[in-house]
Amino acid sequence: MRRRSSMDINRAIRVAVDTGNVVLGTKQAIKNIKHGEGQLVIIADNCAKDVREDIFYYTQLSETPVYTHQSTSIELGAICGKPFPVSALLVLEPGNSAILNVNNEE
């Protein structure tokens, strides 16, 4: 299986935002993860350390996979088509996207 390129992942994120059900923001992502919702968490590379630790803690409890995107929160926001930074997003439903097939390099 070939390794997914950055452009493929960016496109998959955008399609998930446009056609699926995605929660943007660390607070909302953590809230939904605590309730056992969500299929994949994507966090920006520059996400704050304490927030990153909280996300990893709750995703381990709920067995939700985490993907660290190799971009800043500003770039991740732009990929999502938003005019603001996005440090984390939670995919509730992928829509027409293949985002759930992403493999984390961590």
Curated annotation (Swiss-Prot):
Keyword set includes Ribosomal protein: yes
One BP term from GO: translation
Molecular function GO labels: RNA binding; structural constituent of ribosome
Keywords noted in UniProt: Ribonucleoprotein, Ribosomal protein
GO cellular component: cytosolic large ribosomal subunit
Domain of life where this protein originates: Archaea
Entry-linked InterPro entries: Ribosomal_eL30, Ribosomal_eL30-like, Ribosomal_eL30-like_sf, Ribosomal_eL30_CS, Ribosomal_eL8/eL30/eS12/Gad45
HAMAP family (alphabetical): Ribosomal_eL30
Family note: Belongs to the eukaryotic ribosomal protein eL30 family.
Protein name (record): Large ribosomal subunit protein eL30
Gene: rpl30e
